[in-house]
Structures are given as structure tokens and as C-alpha cells.
Amino acid sequence: ASDCMFGNGKGYRGKKATTVMGIPCQEWAAQEPHRHSIFTPETNPQAGLEKNYCRNPDGDVNGPWCYTMNQRKLFDYCDVPQCVSTSFDCGKPQVEPKKCPGRVVGGCVANPHSWPWQISLRTRYGKHFCGGTLISPEWVLTAAHCLERSSRPASYKVILGAHKEVNLESDVQEIEVYKLFLEPTRADIALLKLSSPAVITSKVIPACLPPPNYVVADRTLCYITGWGETQGTYGAGLLKEAQLPVIENKVCNRYEYLNGRVKSTELCAGNLAGGTDSCQGDSGGPLVCFEKDKYILQGVTSWGLGCARPNKPGVYVRVSRFVTWIEGIMRNN
């Protein structure tokens, strides 16, 4: 069942070794029947050009191919099926999260794929600049300020199922953005519709949305995740997590903390002693809280005063206040 591909199959590492016409593939390292100087294990060490398996080292839109054993046919495509979604419940990772306590300054590196709704929002050239959360196969929630650089969907792409920020694993999914939706009252929240649905796998699972207007109780322990490149605390490019308590708005708005700046459509979280904060996360990334048996997306990383400073908790968009808007956009688009 795993002998399938995502997208154009650039990351395909399966064992298919015949073309659509049934001709066996030539080994990538061999020079007969066809001599070739490009696409050998030496020229493309990252492309998985082992034995004579079908591969897509050049990202050909028609998918994986190989040089053939027929002297009259240099290369041909292979018939590799698209992977199909498995059904997993929202908010239930297939890998148990580490849940490292918030006393760890700056959080810790996450267990790979334990936060499977975390996405990386990238420029079209592949540079990571914001986080986001998969909330259904076709929809990602992020911060509106992440989309200030361009109003064109083509400027962005989404990477799903990643643990490393660079040197992406071969089975990550890379999907173009079809449309952007900014929240109409100018809240720092936005929806991205993907140009094709994500394939739901054990590494790519949506987070659950909260009930409308739900209020997370004071001192609930929640988790933020991200590659944390926002402030130069370099997590060696691996996904990080940090545990943070939610602070009720009444407390957060006290003079010694955020002094009345937090709106009812926002939520505070952080250790009032400082040390962990969404500098470790990413703008637009998730704040999730475990409830009963699943993780619920309660916050979108929005702003903070400085970074992990004492008495200055991070501020998140309160997702529950926008669930009605989110569900409406998803239903009508």
C-alpha cells in the first residue's frame, strides 16, 4: 500500500521498476543500453536513484520515470498511483507528543510527526517564514500578518508532514495555495485553501476546532509548536514544542502584565516568569490544548511584547471566537 506517491512523485522512494509499457527500467548507475551523464547516483545523491527504481529527480510534471532497457526508447514514465487518505480522527496524533514541561527554557525538540497538523508556510521558492495549522484536508489556518508580503496565492506554498525545516524528508507533501481569505474584522487570522486536498496519513492529520466562543479555562496547559526561526533561537531546524499555561484575560490585562491591551478575541499564554514563549513557535502556528481525548486548536500565534520576557505572556488569536467565520468560509468555498 505504501508504493504510492504524493503530488508529482519527486519524493517517491518505492520499488516500481517497469515503465507504463511494461519495459524494465535501466539501473540509474548503468550506462547501457543508454549512456547518460545526468541523473546518476553521483550527480543526484539526494534523489534516491537506487537500483532501477522509477524516480522523479527533475520534478517532471508527468511523474516518476526511468531510462529503459529498450535500446530504441531512452526513457519512459512509470505508473505509480497517488497515495490515498487514511481516516484518522482530528486532533489525535499517531505518535505520542513528548509534552516536555514548560520549565525547559525554550521548549524542546518535538518527537517527529507528533504534531501532525503543523504546517510550514513558505515562499514559492521554499523558504519557511510562518507556521500554520491544517484544520481539514483542504484548509489551513494561519495569522493574517503572515500574508502581508503578497495578496497572490501563487506567492505561497504549504509543506505538510515535515519534521526538519530544510533537507525535507522524501514523504513530505508540498501543496500550492489556491486562495487566501482574511478575517473581515481585521483580526490576525486567515484561511488558506489548498489547490488540492492534503493526503491524510499518520504524519498529516488536522487539528480539531473548538466549539464557537468556547473559553479555555485559566491555567490550562497547552502546547505551541514551530520551527522557531522568528528570533534567531535556532532549533537546529527541527520542529520544537513548548508547554504553556493559558492565563485568563482578566489576569493578563493587569497593570503588571499586558495592562489592558488584550482583547476578548485574543488569549494569553506563557510562564509569567519568562523563558518560554512563541519565539519558540512561529507566527501563524498553533496553540493546541488537550481535552478529553484530543488536541483542539485554541490559539493562533499572533504577537508578544519582546521574547520570553518575564511578565509579558504571548498573545494568540482566540480561535473559538472565529469558528463561525471559519466554518462559513469552508462551507461556501
From Swiss-Prot:
Disulfide bonds join C4-C83, C25-C66, C54-C78, C90-C208, C100-C108, C130-C146, C222-C289, C252-C268, C279-C307. The active site is at H145 (charge relay system), D188 (charge relay system), S283 (charge relay system). Residues 4-83 form the Kringle domain. SMART domains: KR, Tryp_SPc. Residues 104-331 form the Peptidase S1 domain. It is found in: Secreted. Belongs to the peptidase S1 family. Plasminogen subfamily. The keyword Methyltransferase does not apply. It comes from Canis lupus familiaris. One of its GO terms (cellular component) is extracellular space. Plasmin dissolves the fibrin of blood clots and acts as a proteolytic factor in a variety of other processes including embryonic development, tissue remodeling, tumor invasion, and inflammation. In ovulation, weakens the walls of the Graafian follicle. It activates the urokinase-type plasminogen activator, collagenases and several complement zymogens, such as C1, C4 and C5. Cleavage of fibronectin and laminin leads to cell detachment and apoptosis. Also cleaves fibrin, thrombospondin and von Willebrand factor. Its role in tissue remodeling and tumor invasion may be modulated by CSPG4. Keywords: Blood coagulation, Disulfide bond, Fibrinolysis, Hemostasis, Hydrolase, Kringle, Phosphoprotein, Protease, Secreted, Serine protease, Tissue remodeling, Zymogen. The record marks D277 as: Site of substrate specificity. It catalyses: Preferential cleavage: Lys-|-Xaa > Arg-|-Xaa, higher selectivity than trypsin. Converts fibrin into soluble products. It is an enzyme of class 3 (hydrolase). This is Plasminogen. Gene3D superfamilies: Plasminogen Kringle 4, Trypsin-like serine proteases. The keyword ATP-binding does not apply. The record marks R152, R186, S264 as: Interaction with streptokinase. Pfam families: Kringle, Trypsin. Its EC number is 3.4.21.7. PROSITE patterns: KRINGLE_1, KRINGLE_2, TRYPSIN_DOM, TRYPSIN_HIS, TRYPSIN_SER. Kringle domains mediate interaction with CSPG4. The modification Phosphoserine is found at S120. Interacts with CSPG4 and AMOT. Interacts (via the Kringle domains) with HRG; the interaction tethers PLG to the cell surface and enhances its activation. Interacts (via Kringle 4 domain) with ADA; the interaction stimulates PLG activation when in complex with DPP4. Angiostatin: Interacts with ATP5F1A; the interaction inhibits most of the angiogenic effects of angiostatin.
